[in-house]
Amino acid sequence: MSGWRKIYYKLLNLPLKLLVKSKVIPADPVSELGLDPSRPILYVLPYNSKADLLTLRAQCLAQDLPDPLIPLEIDGVQLPSHVFIENGPRVFRYYVPKQESVKLFHDYLDLHRNNPALDIQMLPVSVMFGRSPGREGHGTPHLRVLNGVQKFFAVLWLGRDSFVRFSTTVSLRRMASEHGTDKTIAHKLARVARMHFSRQRLAAVGPSLPARQDLFKKLLASKAIEKAVADEARSKKISHEKAQQNAITLMEEIAANFSYEAVRLSDRVLSWTWNRLYQGINVHNAERVRQLAQDGHEIVYVPCHRSHMDYLLLSYVLYHQGLVPPHIAAGINLNFWPAGPIFRRLGAFFIRRTFKGNKLYSTVFREYLGELFTRGYSVEYFVEGGRSRTGRLLEPKTGTLSMTIQAMLRGGTRPITLVPIYIGYEHVMEVGTYAKELRGAIKEKENLLQMLRGLRKLRNLGQGYVNFGEPLPLTTYLNTHVPQWRDAIDPIEAQRPSWLTPAVNDLANQIMVRINNAAAANAMNLCSTALLASRQRSLTREQLLEQLDCYLQLMRNAPYAKDTTVPDKTPEELLNHALNMNKFEVEKDTIGDIIILPREQAVLMTYYRNNIQHLLILPSLIASMVMYHRRITRTELLHKISMIYPMLKAELFLHYSKEQLPETLDTLIDELARQQLICDKGSELVLNPARIRPLQLLAAGVRETLQRYAITLSLLSATPSINRGALEKESRIMAQRLSVLHGINAPEFFDKAVFSTLVATLREEGYISDSGDAIQEHTLEVYNMLSALMTPEVKLTIESVSMPAETSNQPEAPETPEPEGKTES
């Protein structure tokens, strides 16, 4: 580099250092993209901009990547280590320098032809200042490339809203070997890079925003809304103009009013807020979503719903991943001042709890949702319908998902892909309110005062987790499961073909399974799981560390799913972090520390335990079986678990099929044997008395679930002809009784939805005949197996209410030594 150029770059770098604070995507490009800093790198930028180049250089030096200003010297030839695909617009248009990118690509390919050992990494990088999508009808296209003067003002105003996006590298060795090294290939490389950057920019900025009134006019002109307006006028005996005004009022209620400036401002506020409230936001598998957006997919984000914080957290994470924040379906209860107008400008559109009896509303909402898809906006909705009060996934509500498929049946949309997302917290600000509601308190309506009270409580929230699950492309799903789905395409009428409801139900279930597959274990939910399993919700520090180590080894060595994330910290580090959250008490004596979960916190902590209950349910069940039988064959263990697995699968959205269950159990058994929690004697699995304490704590994780199943099966066995409604009601009453008598703190223990799912599963599995009567011999077999795993006191409580005397004379469980840390039911 010449001396003058060095001086020029140094002078230009001075204002950039002050004005530019760019984010790098992904956060750790070396590990996430598999970059090798020891190999030569050719940086490829979309167009000639010295500001972009110096911004890139700052990030490269921060990431320990080669300096893009230092040329590469290969075989005695010196070539620039960066290349601009386009020259870009000029302030003085009469001077257009010669395009160098094709020549430089050709020179590099030539070097590979002459040196078989050479393999240069071609690394595409885009630098963006600001992400305003622009408005429809404005003269300047929103994807324009800036000239020098425009870039100066962009840096001045948007320097702190800039990002450097690294993409996956391309091996020039592979290009040379597979495609050759002539100039045609160099031209092709430049053309592909140009397309890559164009798609990437569209993914980051999104389509132009319509004027709100223009959008309403377009919706009013749609055939479906015209018909709904006419029906409204006829059914309510009002004028056509009045019916049309009703439709516009509904559009005003529903539609978002997205503003890039509001997003920019909220990013500043949220960045400040997260840094003070959270100790970190952990994001996993975001590259999947970036790739989908770049490939032109219409993305529908379907996260689990833990807290009102979910809306803000997910939009914040997506914005920092270089993606457009989605349009979010929010409950109409959030449309209060000032939250409603703010959320609306951040992309929220509002949805009522029910559409029943209002055809005009359902038509307007469906057409609005379809218009979002047609225009290419990403959309987010919570398939659970509302926030989970128990920490488990709720049964999915399928209305909006059904409308998503109906939007596909209008034709003309881009490929729609559902992206399940697990959102997890170490502290949920509403958890105290959830506990009150589960005890029967009336849900308080959202308002400004409630919001201010909630904000006042925000402090020390620990870590947050956003894990992107395995995407579910709708076209691929429909092609596989409903090959004839395109026959139902109709651009005017909303279609409800016979296959729609079964397909939507299956899709909803798959979404929930994939959300659970992407679960994040953390310090809070692991410590809560261990302490809630213990006798008096207390363990010595050594016992708790031993149990945390047991959980961590299980999750690492026999992982639940490839998308599940497990902390990379030691048990000691996790415990210290959890203690700093001020949820637990520490009592010190001359022997050592005792970690205590206070009684008033116990119900609240079940929420966090339930977040990861599905990850440990099968190991807990194996532990419970071995604890009772003391020695059991693998075949017998598999038979017993197979009887109740369908119930667990339906309740907890487990991903293993019946066919996968034997192999899964073998893997878990091998890991439990490796930890010496059980002894594998070849044909039999045997209790290991030396490690009975951690095995007992592990077994406690499934105890309440099995008790709940035993309640329902005991009622079915005693009264085979009981109807479904009565069975669910009686089960809940008995569960409440059991929870009072035996000190069960879990609020989901007598949850109505849990028993509804259980009864539906029993019918599907053939325990209840088509006539509605239970098949007593089947229900009794499972009940007897379950009751053997319970303490005599719990068993007696259940049978004293439900079971006739002749069916309740099963043998007692053999006595087991009761070490410190055993749980009482």
From Swiss-Prot:
State the EC number(s).
2.3.1.15
Q: Can you cite a GO biological process for this protein? A: phospholipid biosynthetic process
What GO molecular function annotations does the UniProt record carry, in alphabetical order?
glycerol-3-phosphate O-acyltransferase activity
UniProt-listed CDD domains: LPLAT_DHAPAT-like
Q: Which reaction does it catalyse?
A: sn-glycerol 3-phosphate + an acyl-CoA = a 1-acyl-sn-glycero-3-phosphate + CoA
- Note down the stretches annotated as region Disordered: 803-825
What does UniProt give as the signal peptide span?
none
Query: What SUPFAM superfamilies does the database record attribute to this sequence?
Result: Glycerol-3-phosphate (1)-acyltransferase
Localization terms from the record: Cell inner membrane
Cellular component aspect of the GO annotation: plasma membrane
UniProt KW keywords: Acyltransferase, Cell inner membrane, Cell membrane, Lipid biosynthesis, Lipid metabolism, Membrane, Phospholipid biosynthesis, Phospholipid metabolism, Transferase
Motif range for HXXXXD motif?
Answer: 305-310
To which protein family does this belong?
Belongs to the GPAT/DAPAT family.
Q: Reproduce the free-text note on domains from the UniProt record.
A: The HXXXXD motif is essential for acyltransferase activity and may constitute the binding site for the phosphate moiety of the glycerol-3-phosphate.
Would you tell me the protein name for this molecule? Glycerol-3-phosphate acyltransferase
